[in-house]
Amino acid sequence: MNIPIDRVTQLQDIYIFETAINQTVSNIQKKKKNYFRVSLVLLTLLIISLVWCFSKYKLQQQEFIINNGNNSNIQQLQQQQQLNNLDSTTIYTTNDNGDINFHNDNNNNNNYRDNQSSNQKIEQQTLTALDYSLLFLPSSVLSLSLIFSLIIYFSIDDPFLFITRCNSTLYLFNIYYCFSNKKIMILPKKQLNNNYYSSDNYSNYQQQPQQQPQQQQQYNTGYNQHQYTDENEYNHRGNRLVSNPSSTIQRNKKFDTNNNYNFNNNNYNYNSNFNNNNNNNNINNNNNNTNNSNINIISNNNNNINNNNNIINNNNNNNNNNNINNSAYSNFNNSNGYNYTN
């Protein structure tokens, strides 16, 4: 039993739909804005960290080059000092045994130790893998966080796609959600541009089925009578037909028995139905003719009977007249005394 829906309830339902859609769309937009801001902040921090890393790396390279130049100069000076010290500090001493010993100052040993320490400092100033990792650690962390934020940003539902899904269900109730107005609107009525359903075409369409059986019968008879004689002709199944002097048609491939049987049955059923319709029409015509003949016969018989009755009445009248005349003549003869015959 169809219960009529109140207008107020319809408006309440529409208001509920509007509020729900607007809330979901606003939440989606807020989430997208928040993650977009986060991604922008991470992108700026990543750019700053990369700039700092490259600047730090260049500064360390410059310091390394400067230290190498200073160390090379120091080494040259130390070598010259060693040579000068060797020349100035060599002392010839003689022992009791008469051996000559060369005594160098302790400055030579000290200079050698200084050279070793400077070489160790140069080796320590070169950057290692740990230094590189610490240098690029903040930039790598920021890049990973930026990638995750972008993934989350694009994983959030799009408001346009959400509205299209909502409209796909609202179309069933002849309403839709307008994104620009943010309201539920009624669908406009469809206007048919073609004039197929006009009065003239509809009347012609009603008259067409009366002519279809004759046209279809002519088509079937024409198809059965048609014969292919050309070598490049093909039948309705696509099989090539080759002319033969003994027979008009020779098929390269025989028809399937089932399909041929069904095709012939369809023609037989249609022709039989059409013949039955014609027979029924003929029977109706015969019935009409018999009715007309019976009516004519009955009317003719009635007319003949009436004519016979008229003849009988005329005969009776003649007989009455003759009797009257005879009686009058007899009375006249009797009164005059002589015989008179009619």
Swiss-Prot record:
Region (Disordered): 198-220, 311-342
Signal sequence, renumbered to the chain: none
Keywords: Membrane, Transmembrane, Transmembrane helix
Keyword hit for Nucleus: no
Bilayer topology term: Multi-pass membrane protein
Protein's cellular compartments: Membrane
Keyword Metal-binding: no
GO CC annotation, single: membrane
Transmembrane domains' residue ranges: 35-55, 134-154, 161-180
Protein name: Uncharacterized transmembrane protein DDB_G0284971
